[in-house]
Amino acid sequence: DECFSPGTFCGIKPGLCCSARCLSFFCISLEF
C-alpha cells in the first residue's frame, strides 16, 4: 500500500504516513 509523505493531508486515512505521524490532519515528520 502507498503511504503519504510528510506534509500530506491524512485526516481521511490516518496512520498511512511514511515515517511520519498524523497530527492535526497532516503527516508530521518524526525527524527534524
From Swiss-Prot:
InterPro entries: Conotoxin_d-typ_CS
Transmembrane segments: none
Superkingdom of this protein's organism: Eukaryota
Location, primary (coarse class): secreted
Disulfide bonds listed in the record: 3-18, 10-22, 17-27
Modified residues (4-hydroxyproline): 6, 14
Tissue specificity remark: Expressed by the venom duct.
Location in the cell: Secreted
GO CC terms, sorted: extracellular region; host cell presynaptic membrane
Gene Ontology molecular function: any one: toxin activity
Keywords, sorted A to Z: Disulfide bond, Hydroxylation, Ion channel impairing toxin, Knottin, Neurotoxin, Presynaptic neurotoxin, Secreted, Toxin, Voltage-gated sodium channel impairing toxin
Signal peptide (residue range): none
Free-text comment on this protein's domains from its UniProt entry: The presence of a 'disulfide through disulfide knot' structurally defines this protein as a knottin. The cysteine framework is VI/VII (C-C-CC-C-C).
Function: Delta-conotoxins bind to site 6 of voltage-gated sodium channels (Nav) and inhibit the inactivation process. This toxin acts on Nav1.2/SCN2A, Nav1.4/SCN4A, Nav1.5/SCN5A (weak activity), Nav1.6/SCN8A (EC(50)=2.5 uM).
Note: Negative results: does not show activity on rNav1.3/SCN3A, Nav1.7/SCN9A, rNav1.8/SCN10A, Kv1.1/KCNA1, Kv1.3/KCNA3, Kv1.4/KCNA4, Kv1.5/KCNA5, hKv11.1/KCNH2/ERG1, shaker and DmNav1/para.
Family: Belongs to the conotoxin O1 superfamily.
Protein name per the record: Delta-conotoxin-like CnVIC
Organism of origin: Conus consors (Singed cone)
Lineage: Eukaryota, Metazoa, Spiralia, Lophotrochozoa, Mollusca
